Amino acid sequence: MKSKRQLAYLKRYGGHLMQDQRWRDRLSRVEVELTALEITNLRFLDRMRRTGQPPGADVSMLKIKGTEIQQGLTELMLEATDPAAGDALSVAVRKRYLSMRKTTIYAGSNEIQRNIIAKMTLGL
């Protein structure tokens, strides 16, 4: 939910960046990835409900994509705020940006998660 609010904020208050086609493309890409992640999550939950099987490599994939999407959003938020302003929003966005860097590490680095996926799906 927080990611959707961040997307809405960026669309509404992106200011001069909304004039930049590359920046809008990046914003659109993150939005599409977030929607795809939500749909995938719902599919996994539905399959678990129907079959009673515990999640497998799905959880690792969700963790990887989720952290990548969060990092992409915070990068866009950082670009959309004026770091020189020093206002509460700019400070909060900088803190969030730095905090999101660690999400690829906790709960197992994304590289470890990729190894888990390879082992579970390919039997490596």
Question: Where would I find each of the regions flagged by the language model?
Answer:
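Alpha-helical interface subdomain recognition
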Residues: M1-L124
